[in-house]
Structure formats: C-alpha cells, structure tokens
Amino acid sequence: MRILLQLFGFLAWSIHSFANPIKVEVKEVNGKWSFYRDGKPYEVKGAGGHDHLEKLVDIGGNCIRTWSTDNALEILDAAHAKGLTVMMGLWAQHERHGFDYDDPVKVKAQLDAFRSEVMAIKDHPALLMWGVGNEVDLFYTNTNVWYAIEDIAKMIHEVDPNHPTCTVTAGLDKEEVRLIKERAPSIDVYGINTYGDLGNIKKNIREYGWTGPYVISEWGPNGHWEVAKTEWNVPIEQSSHEKAVVYEERYRDYIVGDADHCIGSFIFLWGQKQETTSTWYGLFSERGETGEVIDRMQRIWTGKEATNRAPILESCLLNAASKNQNVKVMAGDRMEALLKVSDPDGDRLVVNWLIVPESTDIKSGGDAESAPLPVKRKVTKGSKDAVSMFAPSEEGGYRLFVFVYDGHGHYAYENIPFWVNKRSAEMGQARMIQMKKFDSINP
C-alpha cells in the first residue's frame, strides 16, 4: 500500500565506508529465478516497514522494505544487527503530487540527489536491492516518468555493481509492463503492490510479456477499493480472523505457488496506520500488539506455532445483523452487539468496544490520513460476548469497533459500519453513558 513520504530534499549525504559489501545477484538457474546473496540462493520473506525488527526475526522473516532513504543508515544498521536485509527505497516523485517529468531541471536534480544517496550507503552489508520508485504510475498521465526511472536504475548499475534494481507499480497493467521493458531496461526485478488481485499475477505477468523475476512488494487483505460497500458507500473491512485466513491462503497459493518467477514478497503493513480505518492494513495495534495474521505467517515461515497465540474473533453482530447487512439505527436508540471470540491458549480476555465516526479524511495511494476521534459515551452494560449501548445522537455514518486483548501482546478486532438516522424532536432524548472496558475470562 502506499505510504506518503516527504518530498525529496537535497540534503548533504556523506559516503560511508563499509568493509565488504555483500554482492547480490538475480539469476535464472534451471528455469527458476532467485536472488543470490554472497553466492547463495536467498528467498525473501519480507515485511513492508522498519519497526518491530525482533518480532520479524522471531516469526522467520529475513528482509524489510523501505519507501525512501529517510534514516537509511540507521535502518540498515538496525537490520544488519538482527541479521535482516533491506530493499532500500528511492522515493521518485509522483505526478499526482505536482512533479513534472517534462521539466529537465527537476528531473536532473532528482537524479543527482539519488546519486548522492546511493553512493552513501551502496556498500552496506544489509543492502539487498534498490527500490526505484513506488507506484509512480498511480493516477499518472505522463509516461515520461519511465525514462527517469531508467536514468536512475542505469546510474545505480554504474556506481553500484553489487545490487539489483526494482521498480514498483500499483497493481499489474499490461501497458506498464510494456513501458518498463521498453523505457527502463536497467530494471532487474518487477515489483508489484497487489491485494485482492494477487491470485491473477502469475497468469497476467506472463501474458503481459514480463519474462524475468518479480517480487510482490506489498500484499495483504483485500484493499478498501476492492470490497463490498454499504448503501451509504463506505467499504466493509475484513476482521482480523478473516484477514488471517486470506494471508495464509494467498501466500501458499500465489507466492509460493509461483516459485519459478516470484523471488520474494513483503507483507503489508509491518506497523500501524490510519488508512480508511485504523486497522485495515496494519499488522500491529497502536500499542504494538499483534494479531492472528502474524501467528499464521510464523507457522508458514518457520513450521512452528507461536508459544502464545492471538485471540480468534469468529463473528460480531449489531442488532442481530452482520456488517454486510447495512445496519441502520435511530439516533439515541439502544443497540445490542454480540461477539463470538475464543483464545487458543485459554487466556483471560479484555474486550473494548468503541464507536467511531466514519472517516472523512480519505486520501489515495496511502497518503497520510487523520483518524476520527471515538464517540466518548454510550456503552451501558456488557460482558465478554455481549454489550448494550446507545447510538450516537448525530446523524451520519459510524463504525462499531471491538478489540479483544489477551494480556500477552496479542489482539483481535472487527468493525461494523452502521448509519444513524436523525431523531425527531418528539421522540425524546436517550440517556448518555460513558464508554468503558469489560474484563472477562474465557469459558
């Protein structure tokens, strides 16, 4: 998915001296493409983000991806200390943010800035590959950007013979494949950010004419643009359990399932962010808890179960309706929610219910969004699996979030979008009660 990064600044980069860069190549051997790091095959089990590195190592990951060179040396050093490698991003500017790829002065300035950045860190032992641009094709009209991508990739090969280059597109499009092949031949690896369409990549990339290796540079749950919507046009999010099932199936069927050409992948997002909701893409809570997705990835990557696993949230209903049933209530009316959740370790669970207004700060391409504040009232009584509350007094769209914590650094979640209709004056006002948490023990 797409993270908004600062416009490139022409900062003074100093060249760092490293004892011995580790050579990375991309080679085809007996019909199978692979990374070769220090002469040995290297399968990328990656994550998009640069925090929680110890957790990534614990679950069997070996590589992280950045989108820019911000704090590059610090990130490389931290990764190297944990035995991880880095796909280092070079944030090529986007047309949708106002950059003009017909302006030779700006294009050259960007190239010169990247040259300095590459020279500074090219010999770091944690460096795996250069990510030359991320989704520069998103909502673009000027295809000259691919000539600029070629200039950057060609420059990298001139100054750094030890690391391959990759460029990343938003999904996979036949025209982009053609343009990259024709205009950016110095790109070694095709990077694809894809979500619900991951299952079509193996077939499409061959049909579109890319015969070399590729990485799935971002993947995860169904994107907010790919799912069903309510009658009031907001997307319906998968629960933590639904996402866990999807991650496991997609990895086994579509990433491992194209081992001849897919030479690695990066689960998204190795962190937390607001994008449509606070939970859509992040694999961590705001406090750093992890969910069922990470448990499943650990089992896939290591063959071992986590010593303590996240709760499994099987279902949640609001007024006896699921999230797919366009729940509507009157302002101030009492609502009833039912939850079915279990913990594989029998841990004591804490359940937290929140009513949050539907986000109005919706951006595109992963640009930064502000999170709406929860409605600070309404829960009247509850237990681990049931709660009663009053609907908000203001008309509009909301989401009922439920978060379940096991006290061991794990959580589960679900949200149900609902619409509040305006209450007429003669209907009277409902009593408002402060929201709180409920603590309960697994049966």
Predicted regions and their residues:
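Bacterial Sec-dependent N-terminal signal peptides
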Residues: 1-20
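Active-site mouth of glycoside hydrolases
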Residues: 27-30, 36-187, 199-200, 209-210, ...
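Substrate-binding clefts and catalytic carboxylate motifs of secreted carbohydrate-active enzymes
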Residues: 29, 37, 41-46, 57, ...
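Substrate-binding cleft/loops of secretory-pathway carbohydrate-active enzymes
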Residues: 171-202, 224-228, 271-278
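Residue-level recognition of secondary-structure-to-loop junctions
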Residues: 388-394
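Extracellular interdomain linker/stem segments of modular secreted and single-pass surface proteins
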Residues: 420-427
